[in-house]
Amino acid sequence: MKKISSAVLICMMVLQVGAQQGVYEMNSSARQSVSLNSTGSAGKNDSWSMKKYSDAATGEQVSSPGYQADGWLPAIVPGTVLNSLVYNKVYPEPYYGDNNRRSRGLIPDIHDAGAGFYHYWFRKTFKVPATLNGKKLWLKFHGINYRAGVWLNGKKLGTMAGMFQ
């Protein structure tokens, strides 16, 4: 069967994303879910990557299959922009001591840095299982905080504004 290669790209402000849990039901009439979380299972590389919005190409380009995401940082999904930046050692752990105290200046405060400081593209490449070929598919996000544009294979699918809509 033909394998379909897809890329999902999300531009988010103050990101909090949760992808659907990986559950395959035994009932043939039940809906199937494929997890897009960043935690791999069974040796698969389920990684997301991220790049500052202003430093990346257009949504059409970065969401296209075959796009080379060189220089992108690993991202944690579900998580936040700050969570992924801490993971990549860009900023110190905010819950250690008083690292997150605004007066220390270790972690930029959105009030000082501006909302655009936390605008990032999040990207993931995945294959749709052959058992789902020809079927109507849904991308379900369990929480985007606060705004996102969703792209798939070079096409903008839509935008969201407001938590958990």
Language-model regions, residue ranges each:
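Mature N-terminal segment immediately following signal peptide/propeptide cleavage
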Residues: 33-54, 65-75
